[in-house]
Amino acid sequence: MTGRVCVLVMDSFGIGASLDAARYGDAGANTLVHIYEACKRGECDIEGVRKGPLMLPNLAGKGLYHAAMASSGLSFIDLATLAIPSGYYGYAVEQSLGKDTPSGHWEMAGVPVTFEWGYFPDKPYCFPEELISEFIKQCNLPGVLGEKHASGTIIIDELGEKHIRTGKPIVYTSADSVFQIAAHEEAFGLQRLYDICKIARNLVDKYQIGRVIARPFTGKPGSFKRTGNRKDYATPPPEKTLLDFLKEDGREVIAIGKIADIYAHQGVTQEIKADGNMALFDATLSAMKTAPQGSLVFTNFVDFDSSYGHRRDIAGYAHALEQFDARLPELDALLQPDDMVFIAADHGCDPTFPGSDHTREHIPVLVFGPQVNSKFIGRRDCFADIGQSIAEHLQLSSPLAHGVSFL
């Protein structure tokens, strides 16, 4: 058994449109480069918070810009001004049919999603009548509100007051395979929201829906705010993932943030919840201080996606990237001789793009650690190459069914 592995998923941090992006309406998407260019033009200044060009010295030193240029072919920065990357760097192409969170994470852990998720049509009253009537009946509800495609923050502003007055939860969806339920934590009850989400999870299985998401909020009309008590109720992966094999082998699998939810709590030995990217980074550092040899620490940094990508907040995304970048030396300082850190993403969510949905993009693959030398790993044809490489480093008894190790 050798070292430990820490995986940091920068949720939605794409680095260039995939070759099939046009099929998804995402031709030309590039989350990183478009944020970089907006900052360069002075469009991402936040008084007292950030100003000017995007500054990611630590990610740059680990090969982010080299990987992004290889991914997109765009010469958005002079590589001659950068040092040779300190670890492995490249990019990966998604083989799963979706551009969603479960697909990206499952593929990363060795299980590409080769089936089509179910989706709800973008029209008023988008959910099947049978689904809604059964949901109302089984949950003993007076009815529901919403029933459409919507931004989560906009729909609670629109319907939050009526929700409190009537006791009807707000149900909505997006371009992803999701059934989302928003409810006020005090007026409706947080545990009650979780309870009806569990019922919804069973009801949407027949429609091949990937996730039911609890979206609690607090506050008063005009100042409603979503809380950190979100929960994802995912359908289980169709095959065993890297996490399952590690757990079966007696390893510690420490899931931080929404990782456990994404894998339907399978293959996890310890779950740690935290709200916000910086709290998630704190939790990651704490886990790395005590994680035993041969273990996996796996963190999803959801704010990039939920707070900035979907909301098309370019300046906020830039600031979040800089905050994340500034914390990396703290992680470096905790690494033991044989440890490896993998930085990746699960899909794109270009904040300069129309709409509010994910974008079909390549993801960065950056690997560093005390024993990791500089190496361009090029284009990886499947996110599962990440999982296969982790399996090799952690010396699993047999390789994963998908993916090619780049170690």
From Swiss-Prot:
CDD domains the UniProt entry points to: PPM (cd16009)
InterPro entries in UniProt: Alkaline_phosphatase_core_sf, DeoB, Metalloenzyme, Phosphopentomutase_DeoB_cap_sf
Catalysed reactions listed for this entry: 2-deoxy-alpha-D-ribose 1-phosphate = 2-deoxy-D-ribose 5-phosphate; alpha-D-ribose 1-phosphate = D-ribose 5-phosphate
Principal EC category: isomerase
Cellular localization per UniProt: Cytoplasm
SUPFAM superfamilies in UniProt: Alkaline phosphatase-like, DeoB insert domain-like
GO molecular function: magnesium ion binding; manganese ion binding; phosphopentomutase activity
GO cellular component: a single term: cytosol
Residues the entry annotates as binding Mn(2+) 1: 11, 346-347
EC number of the protein: 5.4.2.7
NADP keyword on record: no
Binding site for Mn(2+) 2: 305, 310, 358
Pfam families cross-referenced by the UniProt entry: Metalloenzyme
Pathway: Carbohydrate degradation; 2-deoxy-D-ribose 1-phosphate degradation; D-glyceraldehyde 3-phosphate and acetaldehyde from 2-deoxy-alpha-D-ribose 1-phosphate: step 1/2
Keyword Iron-sulfur assigned: no
GO biological process: 2-deoxyribose 1-phosphate catabolic process; 5-phosphoribose 1-diphosphate biosynthetic process; metabolic compound salvage; nucleotide metabolic process
Cofactor names: Mn(2+)
Keywords: Cytoplasm, Isomerase, Manganese, Metal-binding
CC cofactor note: Binds 2 manganese ions.
Family: Belongs to the phosphopentomutase family.
PANTHER family assigned: PHOSPHOPENTOMUTASE (PTHR21110:SF0)
Function, as annotated: Isomerase that catalyzes the conversion of deoxy-ribose 1-phosphate (dRib-1-P) and ribose 1-phosphate (Rib-1-P) to deoxy-ribose 5-phosphate (dRib-5-P) and ribose 5-phosphate (Rib-5-P), respectively.
Protein name in the entry: Phosphopentomutase
Organism in which the protein naturally occurs: Legionella pneumophila subsp. pneumophila (strain Philadelphia 1 / ATCC 33152 / DSM 7513)
Biological classification of the source: Bacteria, Pseudomonadati, Pseudomonadota, Gammaproteobacteria, Legionellales
